[in-house]
Amino acid sequence: MAEQETPQFNIELPEEVGQGQYANLAVVLHSQSEFILDFVRLLPGQQSARVHSRQILTPDNAKRLVRLLEQHLACFEQ
């Protein structure tokens, strides 16, 4: 069986996105066709929080994200 090649492509990272957004809480919702990840900043002593980023993924991409996070967490813990 021939080895599958990973497609190569360029990824552009705009400066305002590259600075990132701090989040200390994540909320996950899902439907039959998508996973929604809301990243929230919850400040101490506050009764409300604000979603700072929402990412919408297909189930396949959500599975890929889980695998990547597991790999990186394993490396981090070594």
Question: Positions of the model-derived regions?
Answer:
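N-terminal intrinsically disordered, cationic/polar leader segments
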Residues: 1-60, 67-78
